[in-house]
């Protein structure tokens, strides 16, 4: 059984006199920077000019270029999208690291797949909150926190684990519990969860259910409610108390259907395909494909994204959500094509 550490288990003195540079001010970046500052740490934010810089300055931070922030800091937390990190590291961080500094990530992708290769004379660790940035910030302000994983890739100073734990405590994660992992485990399990279950698996299941009902002549609006809209009700029950809580809360008819039909949808062949997905992740095949896709300007990514946004379930969903004012509207209901922009 994995050991979970809490605030009482962590000594944070090792981080108290260090300056922390948070590179990036998006969902995780703003939460880490604000929580660390509220915990009493000296925080500087590294960004290029733009809206994020304006927001960070409005929030009271000293905002510098990535290079300047990295050169001033003892601990450099990189909270940029995976695909941006290698170039930013090479151009703005690498030459500004000093002996004994700590290079930190919230996801192990670029270290594990050697897209970022740090010098041998720095510590390298990860602190990965298991929740979005807005939740990391909100729970911190409420006196709670979001659990996190931490792991050490390189321990030059002999203090990497202690600094990682202190950082976890600083962002509020130790209030909820921190669990030790490795860069390999965090990266491979995170990618698998996204692809096979949380994102790829769920979206494909929802679309297949919707298409099955509409192909059989049922109204698209009804199919939307049954296969997508009600998903939140079930997920909330799972989140609160696992499978048992969900099954306790639904009708006996629904539970019996779960027992006899669920295994017909996800069977041994599905599990074999999941193993194939995991193998692609473990061998680096997925990472290689994603890296090459970005280098080519994301032609497949953008084409698939446009096609998915035109799926009938999206059209029906947008129309129905306009009739439901109680449903929080998305910030960007129609995702635009994505190109990689690198900060200075």
Swiss-Prot record:
Q: Residues that bind Mg(2+) 2, according to the entry? A: 190, 226, 230
Gene3D superfamilies cross-referenced by the UniProt entry: 6.10.240.10, NAD(P)-binding Rossmann-like Domain (3.40.50.720)
Q: List residues of the KARI N-terminal Rossmann domain.
A: 2-181
Looking at the keywords, is Secreted present? no
Its EC number(s): 1.1.1.86
Q: Which Pfam families match?
A: KARI_C, KARI_N
Task: Give the cofactors, semicolon-separated.
Answer: Mg(2+)
The residues that the entry says bind NADP(+) are 25-28, 48, 52, 82-85, 133
GO-annotated molecular function:
ketol-acid reductoisomerase activity; magnesium ion binding; NADP binding
Write out the pathway annotation from the protein's UniProt entry: Amino-acid biosynthesis; L-isoleucine biosynthesis; L-isoleucine from 2-oxobutanoate: step 2/4; Amino-acid biosynthesis; L-valine biosynthesis; L-valine from pyruvate: step 2/4
Q: Where is the KARI C-terminal knotted domain?
A: 182-327
The active site of this protein is located at 107
> Where, by residue number, does substrate bind?
251
**Cofactor info, note text:** Binds 2 magnesium ions per subunit.
Q: Which catalytic reaction applies to this protein? A: (2R)-2,3-dihydroxy-3-methylbutanoate + NADP(+) = (2S)-2-acetolactate + NADPH + H(+); (2R,3R)-2,3-dihydroxy-3-methylpentanoate + NADP(+) = (S)-2-ethyl-2-hydroxy-3-oxobutanoate + NADPH + H(+)
Keywords tagged on the record: Amino-acid biosynthesis, Branched-chain amino acid biosynthesis, Magnesium, Metal-binding, NADP, Oxidoreductase
PROSITE patterns given for it? KARI_C (PS51851), KARI_N (PS51850)
> What is one Gene Ontology biological process annotated in the Swiss-Prot or TrEMBL record?
isoleucine biosynthetic process
Gene Ontology cellular-component annotations? cytosol
Instruction: Tell me the residue numbers annotated for binding Mg(2+) 1.
Output: 190, 194
Q: Which family does it belong to?
A: Belongs to the ketol-acid reductoisomerase family.
Query: What functional role does this protein have?
Result: Involved in the biosynthesis of branched-chain amino acids (BCAA). Catalyzes an alkyl-migration followed by a ketol-acid reduction of (S)-2-acetolactate (S2AL) to yield (R)-2,3-dihydroxy-isovalerate. In the isomerase reaction, S2AL is rearranged via a Mg-dependent methyl migration to produce 3-hydroxy-3-methyl-2-ketobutyrate (HMKB). In the reductase reaction, this 2-ketoacid undergoes a metal-dependent reduction by NADPH to yield (R)-2,3-dihydroxy-isovalerate.
Its recorded name reads Ketol-acid reductoisomerase (NADP(+))
What is the organism of origin for this protein? Oceanobacillus iheyensis (strain DSM 14371 / CIP 107618 / JCM 11309 / KCTC 3954 / HTE831)
Print the organism lineage.
Bacteria, Bacillati, Bacillota, Bacilli, Bacillales
